[in-house]
Amino acid sequence: MPTLDEAVTTVLTPVFAAGSEIGADLALEEVSVTTAGRRQVVRVVVDRAGDEPGDLDLDAVAAASTAVSEALDESGVLGEAPYTLEVSSPGVDRPLTTPRHWSRARGRLVRAVLTDGTALLVRVVSVDEAGVHGTLEPQMVKGKPPRAKDVGAPRDLAWADLVRGEVQVEFRRPGEDVEDLVADPGADDELDELDELDELDDGDEDEQ
């Protein structure tokens, strides 16, 4: 007998299928159903369909929420009990576990965890059937910096050798100036962090 999570996933899969109203733009990532008192809480994670980098906008999440709610109500999979629906996009801490995840992370700094227990920091350049292709980055890994000759060197990671990837938060990406961040409407948080760091540096100089 399928679990409730599996039953809800079965109901929602056609909603996000290719050719459906929202299936061309959105993909179903995860479904979980929990109980909170007398209510059930249905959490649905959706992402942009396809493998192109980019963020999911609020209008798309709202459209997904409407479609999911209608499908759940029509199916009766949750019975007569009231439920709360939460539809969201994956957070930056979502592990990269599929080729589509990795492809959508092109250009990002990622900590790649390998099957031999080691981890590497790579800038993802491209993704194909063979695996992930990137360049090594100079950040510390397990307390040891990579050798100078390896920094920026191409690194290919086969799918069989990859366990997961973890996207790293960057205050300023390579070649990106503060002026570039200002031009980006979504960069306000990054600018705030940069200002705070500058204030801390100024305070240290005053104390000296």
Swiss-Prot record:
Where are the annotated coiled coils located?
none
Role played: Required for maturation of 30S ribosomal subunits.
Q: Which SUPFAM superfamilies match?
A: YhbC-like, N-terminal domain
UniProt KW keywords: Cytoplasm, Ribosome biogenesis
**Where mainly located?**
cytoplasm
Give the signal peptide, or none. Answer: none
Cellular localization per UniProt: Cytoplasm
Protein origin, superkingdom: Bacteria
Cite the HAMAP family for this sequence: RimP
**Start-end of Acidic residues biased regions:** 177-208
Q: Biological process GO terms, please?
A: ribosomal small subunit assembly; translation
From the UniProt entry, list the residue stretches annotated as the region Disordered.
175-208
Stored InterPro entries? Ribosome_maturation_RimP (IPR003728), RimP_N (IPR028989), RimP_N_sf (IPR035956)
A matching Pfam family: RimP_N
State the family named in the UniProt similarity comment for this chain. Belongs to the RimP family.
- What is the protein name for this chain? Ribosome maturation factor RimP
* An example Gene Ontology CC term for this record: cytosol
Keyword check for Repeat, yes or no.
no
